[in-house]
């Protein structure tokens, strides 16, 4: 039963416990068969049981076990794209690491954890895979939020999400850059 591999990752993420080395080796070795024999709907049933605050660990475990690469290759490919960490320094990080960090911090302390919001954080930068351009020594990702919303819609349909959940997550992905635009004088006046 290859679904047990996903269940082991879920338990490890939810309870923040390490996976025994031989078990981990078996999960990695069987990762291609997990995707061959377990329907995406069954994988998503296990995924829905992951607590929102533990989802970043679950996604990282799925990536390390090479299951995410087959299930959601658009998200796994973000590990190949680099971006500047912030405008103040020249340190870089992968977009996938940035995504995991955002999931880990969503929402900040004092807010209620939201499973669909955390899923939106997983997909918020998926458009960077399709809009990335390297020019004058730096990466740009113009309109990645718009492209990402369309890509997210296709992914969520493939993963058998309900239409209401798809609409909500795509709305969050589409508008996740809104506050950056509103911080200008013109944006504040329009608001």
Identify the function of each model-found stretch.
Residues 2-143, 147-166, 174-179:
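Glycine- and charge-enriched loop/helix tracts that form the active or gating conduit
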Residues 188-191:
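Short, intrinsically disordered, charge-balanced linker/junction segments flanking boundaries
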């Amino acid at each position: 039963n290859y679904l047990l591999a996903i269940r082991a990752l879920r338990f490890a993420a939810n309870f923040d416990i390490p996976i025994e080395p031989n078990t981990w080796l078996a999960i990695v070795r069987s990762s291609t068969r997990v995707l061959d024999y377990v329907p995406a709907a069954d994988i998503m049933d296990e995924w829905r049981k992951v607590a929102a605050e533990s989802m970043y660990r679950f996604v990282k475990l799925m990536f390390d076990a090479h299951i995410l690469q087959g299930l959601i290759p658009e998200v796994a490919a973000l590990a190949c794209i680099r971006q500047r960490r912030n405008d103040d320094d020249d340190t870089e990080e992968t977009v996938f690491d940035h995504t995991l960090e955002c999931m880990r911090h969503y929402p900040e302390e004092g807010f209620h954890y939201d499973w669909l919001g955390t899923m939106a954080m997983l997909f918020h930068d998926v458009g960077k895979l399709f809009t990335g351009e390297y020019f004058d020594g730096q990466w740009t990702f113009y309109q990645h939020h718009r492209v990402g919303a369309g890509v997210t819609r296709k992914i969520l349909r493939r993963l058998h999400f309900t239409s209401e959940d798809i609409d909500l997550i795509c709305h969050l992905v589409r508008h996740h850059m809104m506050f950056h635009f509103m911080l200008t004088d013109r944006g504040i006046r329009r608001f």
